[in-house]
Amino acid sequence: VAPRDGPEDNLAKLAISAMRNRDAPVLLFVANQLFARRDFKRAEIALQAALAIDPQSTMAREVLAAVYQVTGRLEEARQQSELAYASCWCIVDKLPSLARKPSVLLAMNRGSEHIPSTHLLPLERYDKVRCLLDCAKWDDGTELPAHDVIFNLLGEPDSLVEPDPSFDELLRRSGRPLLNTPRAVRETRRDRLAARLRGIESIEVPEVHRIEAEHAAPARLAEELGRRGARYPLLVRPAGMHGGRGVLLATEPSQLSQHSFPAASALYATAYRDYRSADGYYRKYRAIFVDRKPLPYHLAISPQWLVHYFSAEMGAAAAKLEEERRFLEAPRAVLGERAYRALEEIGERLALDYAGIDFSLLPDGTLLVFEANATMLVHPEDAGGETAHKNVHVEAILQAVFAMVERRATRK
């Protein structure tokens, strides 16, 4: 970490001073700064120095595991992760503060934060206790750190254990309110969603078949889908994956044997519904449910059927941004009263405290549901960027989350 010319010179001097003074927390601070700047080599040096001073530092080993992960040293990353949590599976994260802040216990697994919480639960506002359920040793005498509310970050239904005795033990010992029950999360699985939402008027939820791994080999997949009476075209994707990763639009059975799907516990085959608008574009709306109430998050408009905000080039067309702005400012008016009431009822039916939904609007005003689950990411946009208009609506979502968490935290 020797000083270099440029803006990092002071950071290097700080690291050298910390080494001389055997100050592990300062070295960890330096390592985090270097990691954020993608200076992984010097971050590793600072972390190794911190661990030489304090070999029990869970946070230093966590960051070192992250350094190894992003630099492709996967076995070393695994080893550091195991060392980090061998004796510490409840980790308290807090910033110095004179005022008492609500403390939120985050129920999660090692490396599995399905609900991104950086913006939802900022350290400036909350003390956080990360409880790593897959590392928990309930008989080792560990006491749960003080907390006011539990936020279940295990929002990916395909990754949940059924039943989960570790989660049950957490609830038994805690006695505090829980946000996002595992049972409600499990019901958002793609093949269960239609049953969960059955009876809601003015919505369409395409049929979904879940094909377990033993029947999902390329040579057997078409046969299994035929046995179930699935009709083409089908969207076939690996369980637990999002963002279009591994998805195939199959118009005939022969395509299935020619496609290589990423390894997964199962595949989902969803009946494809052409949702193209009259102008030839595909529209995907996203709303976030906070305390079961829908709040608009974005609208992506694309000439391709596989619509994602990051690939829709929204900033390239003023008309797209203006249409999105109208949705964000007046979602009820844009969707229509019938579809908006359906959206509200979906939020109630999901019974999740935090969740999201991706959907489109069909010509007759029916709401076409793509997915609804707790893994939806909410983040501010660049204040000077083309999508900065979203930030006031992002802030509305965050403020609603803050209010919900603090309301539950004060319950007796």
PLM ranges: what are they?
Residues 21, 55, 88-89:
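Short coil turns that delineate tetratricopeptide repeat
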Residues 90-216:
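Conserved N-proximal alpha/beta basic substrate-recognition cap immediately N-terminal to
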Residues 15-16, 49-50, 83-84:
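Canonical positions in the second alpha-helix
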Residues 348, 352, 361-412:
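C-terminal active-site "lid" helix and adjoining low-complexity regulatory extension at the edge
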Residues 243-342, 346:
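Phosphate-binding site of ATP-dependent enzymes
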